[in-house]
Each structure stands twice: as structure tokens, then as C-alpha cells.
């Protein structure tokens, strides 16, 4: 039976609960324990799949096709444990399930209420896989006191009550604001946050206090006294130069030991932090630097491309270089020349996205990379834009475009080199879709196999002829244009096993130009960089010597 750690937050949002959870998971693994991390989000959306990246940041896709919170990306990157659909839930999903059961008559005519029906559904979700791991870490989204989070707080209170004593603990993240005028940290917001938590029946066992300044021993004792926790359980969380310092920093502050003490695990296994020391060394001691331009649509919010930014960092670690990322708004190229914005970059990456806005700029970025021999990685829409660019400017299909843009405009304007994907094979079943289907959960989602063409660049990079990668798209390069594009020199180097869906394209006469329909960034880790990103940065490093 798993031990449960519930992670909550107070005072303000965006304190870093996800990173703290991921770092703690990594530290417990370093001591020989198995872990699984979960995220419970109070918002009423069923999942983040239809939410704007400006609202929510990126959508992290699991192998089994769940569209989840970006924190699950942190969980995977720090622990190496592949997330599942059962590791993420929202109020919307919980309420939807409860209402479906009510319609089926599962509740036998009873009045449906938040307590017990909604809270029971949350508790059932938390308990999934109870016997699979040593520790289950459950992060509650939002902050204590938010009205939409109350059912989740009540559910974890009940869950802890139902379990044997010592089976569950609570870890609460707060902020210690610093007043420059008086030159002191203020503990009152933390005290009030804990008081709010206690008022709903939850007493934190560990306090993680975010601070920009060292926490004096006197203040630590004060927090412990008024929040009713041991002094050793008041853990400082300071701002770091890189998130990959978090496991070592939290270990230095005693977080993992405080957790083991709270569970009365003694003697505690000693941690092996060799991997994280190596990661930290690679981040802090690069032997050079490369500049990568990300030409995207949501560049005002870096969290919209969180996994891509991290995967580039991982590629830098693999090559002992610092990757300097600059965000370029693709719409700028609608009215301005590409060259002044992209000159001096050692590589160009065009990420995924939806809608026509900014796509002409992405096509121009792909053209610039092709014509100027700049390493190019196109992901999802970035691959589609590279194919459209090749069709227009090399294969002489002047009206080449995407059905997505025609659907958005309500009229036919392009020859659809990229079309709406209406059916595909998933496992042993055929999946069908129509243009008018609901948006949520109707894309080609999750891990799919692909066959690589021997002798191609991607086959050399992967060192295999068969791969599986995660997808999130409803538009696809039309296979009927393959012959025309290959006659122009483009190579379709990766295909779905049935040979119907192009997964990877490349220009063989280019130093490094690859487009992939999937999202390789979702499987990259600091201690195991994705091979595409590692080789992309290798090519950028090589190009940096030529620029």
C-alpha cells in the first residue's frame, strides 16, 4: 500500500508546487523508493485540451492519449516515470463522471451532492494504483481558500481519515514576502494560509517556504511555533538559476529527510544523487553556447512551449553547450523580411500550433532555413509548414496549403497538401473523425509507432528502424503528394506502420533539416535527452563554428 503525500499551496499561486513535487519525487527515487505523481486541478474544463495556451500554457500529452497539465511534464522529466491518463483530473472530469453515473441510475435515485458523491469520486481517483508504488504524490492545483478547490481539500481530508494513521502527510507551499523598507521577511501570510488550511480540517506536516532571501533561524522557529510544525519541517525554497538544481537544493534544505521523518521511516536509506550532480554540472559548466530561434504563435507566454524549451536545454546538456533561446513571433514576418530577424541564429525551430494566424511566417522561416543551410526542426505544424514550403517553392505546387486554413476561412483557397485526418489505426482498431466533430479529445492523441527508412538521417539519429512517439494533431500531410514532393528532393523518412501517414520528412542535401508530425519534446529528460534534440543541438553547435 502506497504512502500518500498531498501537496497544497497558499498565499499566492505559481509558487512552484509542480516543481517541488517533481523534485521530491526525484529525491525519494534517489533513496530507492518508487513513486507516482498526480495532479488534481479545480477548474471546470474537462481537460486542458481545448484551453488557450495563453490561459493554461502547454498541453502535456501522455502515452495513453490524455491531454494534461504541464506539471505532468515536470513529473516525467524529473522522475522518468511515464505519466498516464489516471495521473491528471479536473473538477470538470469529476463532475462529468458523477453526472454520467446519475443518468445511468448508478446512485439508485439518491440526491446527488458534493459530499459524498463528488468527494467519493475524487477519493476513488486518488486511490488508483494504490498498490503499485511506495509513494503517491498528489498535487492540488490552485491555492487554499479558492472556492472551486474546496471539494478537493475535503476529499483529501476524508481520504487521510480513512487511511491508517501515518499513511498520509500534507506538504504546504507558502510565500515569505520580503519588505525592503523594513529589511525583513514577513511570516504572517504563511500563518494565515496555514490557519485557512486548518479551518477545513487539514494540518500540514511540512511547510515549504518560498523566499528570495535567507530565512533567519528566529523566523523559522516562529513559523514552526505558530503553524504547529516541527522546526526541521520548515523547509526553505530559494530562487534557483535553473530548475534542475531543485533536487539538490531541496535535499540540502532537508525536504526528503523531513518527509521520511513525518512517515517515521528510520533508518532512512541514503540518497544516491550522482545523476543530479551530473545534470547540475552540465547546466552550470557549458563549453560553449548556441542560439536557437523558436518561431511560433504563442511566444508571449513561454509556458506555451514549456517542454520544447526544456528539451532544448537537455540537448545542450548532451553537447556541453548553453542553449540561448530567443522567441520570434511568426506574425512579424507577415510584414517584415525574415533575414534580419533570423540572421545569426545557429538553428531554427518551428513548434506546433493551431489556426492560420502566423503560418505564413512559419513557412518563410522554413524557407530561410532551407535556403541558408541553417539546422531546422519542425514539430507538428512546423513539419506541415516545411512541407507546404517545399511544395510551393521546390515542387511547383504554387497553391499548396492546409485544409485547416480553408476550414477556418469557410472557403477553398489552397491545394490541400495538408488535409483533415479522417481515419487512422490505433492498436487493432480504426478511428474515424469528421470535420464537424467536437474539439475536445478528438485529435490523434498519444503514442503511435512509426517505421524509419534505413539510411536516412533520422534512422541514424535513433539507431533503430522502429520508434514510438506522442502525437497531438488532427491535420496530416497528404500521402498522395508524396511522389511529387520526393521528385523535388524531399524524403519521407518516417511513416506509420501501414504506410499511410507521413511521420517524418527531411532534406538529405541539407546539413540538418527535419520535420516530425509528433512531439519528441514530451519524452525528453535531463538525464536522458531525446535523440532528435541532442542531434539538433549538435548540428547547431557545428553551425556555430561556421557562422
UniProtKB/Swiss-Prot annotation:
Domain Glutamine amidotransferase type-1, chain residue ranges per copy: 291-546
Binding of CTP, residues: 13, 146-148, 186-191, 222
Entry's Gene Ontology BP terms: 'de novo' CTP biosynthetic process; pyrimidine nucleobase biosynthetic process
Residues binding UTP, per UniProt: 13, 186-191, 222
Pfam family, one: GATase
Catalytically driven reaction(s): UTP + L-glutamine + ATP + H2O = CTP + L-glutamate + ADP + phosphate + 2 H(+); L-glutamine + H2O = L-glutamate + NH4(+); UTP + NH4(+) + ATP = CTP + ADP + phosphate + 2 H(+)
Root EC class: ligase
Name of the protein in its database record: CTP synthase
The species this protein was found in: Roseobacter denitrificans (strain ATCC 33942 / OCh 114)
Gene name tied to this protein: pyrG
Amino acid at each position: 500500500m502506497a504512502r500518500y503525500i498531498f501537496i497544497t499551496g497558499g498565499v499566492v499561486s505559481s509558487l512552484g508546487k509542480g516543481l517541488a513535487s517533481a523534485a521530491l519525487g526525484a529525491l525519494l527515487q534517489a533513496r530507492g523508493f518508487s513513486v507516482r505523481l498526480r495532479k488534481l486541478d479545480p477548474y471546470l474544463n474537462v481537460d486542458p485540451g481545448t484551453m488557450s495556451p495563453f490561459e493554461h500554457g502547454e498541453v502535456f500529452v501522455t502515452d495513453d492519449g490524455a491531454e494534461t497539465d504541464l506539471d505532468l511534464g515536470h513529473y516525467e522529466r524529473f522522475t522518468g516515470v511515464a505519466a498516464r491518463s489516471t495521473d491528471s483530473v479536473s473538477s470538470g472530469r469529476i463532475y462529468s463522471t458523477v453526472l454520467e453515473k446519475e443518468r445511468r441510475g448508478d446512485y439508485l435515485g439518491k440526491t446527488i451532492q458534493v459530499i459524498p458523491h463528488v468527494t467519493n469520486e475524487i477519493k476513488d481517483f486518488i486511490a488508483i494504483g494504490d498498490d503499485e508504488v511506495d509513494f503517491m504524490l498528489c498535487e492540488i492545483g490552485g491555492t487554499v481558500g479558492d472556492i472551486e478547490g474546496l471539494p478537493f481539500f475535503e476529499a483529501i481530508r476524508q481520504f487521510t481519515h480513512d487511511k491508517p494513521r501515518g499513511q498520509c502527510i500534507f506538504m504546504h507551499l507558502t510565500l515569505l514576502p520580503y519588505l525592503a523598507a523594513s529589511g525583513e521577511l514577513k511570516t504572517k501570510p504563511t500563518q494565515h494560509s496555514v490557519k485557512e488550511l486548518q479551518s477545513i480540517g487539514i494540518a500540514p506536516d511540512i511547510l515549504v517556504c518560498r523566499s528570495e532571501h535567507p530565512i533567519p533561524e528566529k523566523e523559522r522557529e516562529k513559523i514552526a511555533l505558530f503553524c504547529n510544525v516541527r522546526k526541521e519541517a520548515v523547509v526553505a525554497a530559494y530562487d534557483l538559476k535553473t530548475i534542475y538544481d531543485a533536487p539538490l537544493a531541496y535535499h540540502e534544505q532537508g525536504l526528503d529527510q523531513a518527509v521520511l521523518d513525518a512517515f517515521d521511516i528510520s533508518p532512512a536509506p541514503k540518497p544516491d544523487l550522482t545523476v543530479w550532480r551530473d545534470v547540475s554540472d552540465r547546466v552550470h559548466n557549458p563549453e560553449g553556447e548556441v542560439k536557437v530561434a523558436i518561431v511560433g504563435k504563442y511566444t508571449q507566454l513561454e509556458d506555451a512551449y514549456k517542454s520544447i524549451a526544456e528539451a532544448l536545454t537537455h540537448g545542450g546538456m548532451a553537447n556541453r553547450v548553453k542553449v540561448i533561446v530567443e522567441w520570434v513571433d511568426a506574425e512579424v514576418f507577415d510584414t517584415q523580411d525574415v533575414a534580419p530577424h533570423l540572421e545569426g541564429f545557429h538553428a531554427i525551430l518551428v513548434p506546433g500550433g493551431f489556426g492560420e494566424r502566423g503560418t505564413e511566417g512559419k513557412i518563410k522561416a522554413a524557407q530561410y532555413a532551407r535556403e541558408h543551410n541553417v539546422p531546422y526542426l519542425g514539430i507538428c505544424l512546423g513539419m506541415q509548414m516545411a512541407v507546404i514550403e517545399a511544395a510551393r517553392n521546390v515542387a511547383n505546387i504554387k497553391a499548396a496549403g492546409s485544409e485547416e486554413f480553408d476550414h477556418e476561412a469557410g472557403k477553398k483557397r489552397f491545394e490541400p497538401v495538408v488535409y483533415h485526418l479522417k481515419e487512422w489505426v490505433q492498436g487493432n482498431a480504426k478511428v474515424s473523425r469528421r470535420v464537424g466533430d467536437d474539439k475536445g479529445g478528438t485529435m490523434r492523441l498519444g503514442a503511435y509507432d512509426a517505421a524509419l527508412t534505413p539510411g536516412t538521417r533520422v534512422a541514424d539519429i535513433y539507431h533503430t528502424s522502429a520508434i514510438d512517439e506522442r502525437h497531438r494533431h488532427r491535420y496530416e500531410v497528404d500521402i498522395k503528394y508524396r511522389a511529387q514532393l520526393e521528385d523535388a528532393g524531399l524524403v519521407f523518412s518516417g511513416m506509420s506502420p501501414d504506410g499511410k501517414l507521413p511521420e517524418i520528412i527531411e532534406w538529405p542535401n541539407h546539413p540538418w533539416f527535419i520535420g516530425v508530425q509528433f512531439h519528441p519534446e514530451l519524452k525528453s529528460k535531463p538525464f536522458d535527452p531525446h535523440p532528435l534534440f541532442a542531434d539538433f543541438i549538435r548540428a547547431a553547435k557545428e553551425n556555430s563554428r561556421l557562422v
